[in-house]
Amino acid sequence: MVLIRVQANLLILQLSYAQKSSELIIGGDECNINEHRFLVALYTSRSRRFYCGGTLINQEWVLTAAHCDRKNIRIKLGMHSEKVPNEDAETRVPKEKFFCLSSKTYTKWDKDIMLMRLKRPVNNSTHIAPVSLPSNPPSVDSVCRVMGWGTITSPQETYPDVPHCANINILDYEVCQAAHGGLPATSRTLCAGILKGGKDSCKGDSGGPLICNGQFQGIASWGAHPCGQSLKPGVYTKVFDYTEWIQSIIAGNTDATCPP
C-alpha cells in the first residue's frame, strides 16, 4: 500500500511540475559564516579546487564518502570564502583512512563512507568545531540542511567562492526507489530532497553533511544528473547506521566491522 501511495503521489507531482522542469536551478543561498564550523573541504596536492566535502566529528576525525578517496588528500577546516580565508582556517592531511569496504567496491546504496584520522588534531576556534554523531535516525518529513562548495548550476557547472546551503526534506525510501530504479528493497541510505525539484546537492558536494534538526544524519552520496530535477531526490549515507562502527574505530578497535 505504501508503494502504491508513493507512486500515485509521484504521478500527481510529475504532472504538476512538468512545465517547471526547465526553470530548475540548484537552489540555496550562501551559508551563514557561523553555521558550518564542522564543514570541511577536500582537495588534492595537485589541484586547489575543492572536489568533496566532509564533516569534523571530533578534534581528530573527519567523516566523508568513500568515493571521495584520492591520493594526496588535503583537508581544509574553518573555511568560508576561498578568496578571503578566515584567520583560523587550518589545513590537515589524513594519517589513516578507514572504510567499510574498499573505496573501489562500495555500492550506490551501501557503505559509501570513509573515516579519516587527521595527522594532527585541530582545536576549537571561531570557525572550527565538531558536530556530534546522531542519537536517533531522522524521521520522514524532517527538514534538513545540505551544504557545500559544489556547483550551483547544472548541467553547466558554476562553482561558488563560498559554501551554499539549502533546506531539503527526508523522504520515504520508496520515493528514491521509484525515482532512480535498481535500488534494493532496503539500504543504509537516506532519501532526501524536494519533490518539485530546484534544491539539491550536486557535483562537488559529495561527502558533505546533511544536518537534520541540528544532528549530523547523512553524507552526500549520489543523485540524478542534471541535479535538482523534480521527482529525483538525492541519496545520502545514513550516518546513524554506522555510529557503532565509527565509535569503535575512534576507540582504537581498527578491526571493527560495519553493519551487514
Swiss-Prot record:
Chief site of localization: secreted
GO CC field: extracellular region; secretory granule
Inhibition and activation profile: Completely inhibited by PMSF, and N-tosyl-Lphenylalanine chloromethyl ketone (TPCK) and poorly inhibited by benzamidine and derivates. Not inhibited by EDTA, heparin and hirudin.
Residues in the signal sequence: 1-18
Protein name per Swiss-Prot or TrEMBL: Thrombin-like enzyme gloshedobin
Leading EC class: hydrolase
GO process annotations (BP): proteolysis
Sites marked Forms a covalent bond with the inhibitor PMSF: 206
Propeptide section residues: 19-24
InterPro entries cross-referenced by the UniProt entry: Peptidase_S1_PA (IPR009003), Peptidase_S1_PA_chymotrypsin (IPR043504), Peptidase_S1A (IPR001314), Trypsin_dom (IPR001254), TRYPSIN_HIS (IPR018114), TRYPSIN_SER (IPR033116)
Disulfide bonds: 31-165, 52-68, 100-258, 144-212, 176-191, 202-227
Assembly behavior: Monomer.
Domain Peptidase S1: 25-252
Pfam families: Trypsin
Role: Thrombin-like snake venom serine protease. The recombinant form clots fibrinogen by cleaving fibrinogen Aalpha chain (FGA), and slowly Bbeta chain (FGB). Has amidolytic activities.
Keyword Protease among UniProt keywords: yes
Localization: Secreted
Extra information: Negative results: has no activity on gamma chain.
Protein source organism: Gloydius shedaoensis (Shedao island pit viper)
Lineage: Eukaryota, Metazoa, Chordata, Craniata, Vertebrata
Glycosylation sites: 123-124
pH dependence: Optimum pH is 7.5-8.0.
Gene Ontology molecular function terms on file: serine-type endopeptidase activity; toxin activity
Active site: 67 (charge relay system), 112 (charge relay system), 206 (charge relay system)
Family from the record: Belongs to the peptidase S1 family. Snake venom subfamily.
Keywords, sorted A to Z: Blood coagulation cascade activating toxin, Disulfide bond, Glycoprotein, Hemostasis impairing toxin, Hydrolase, Protease, Secreted, Serine protease, Signal, Toxin, Zymogen
EC number of the protein: 3.4.21.-
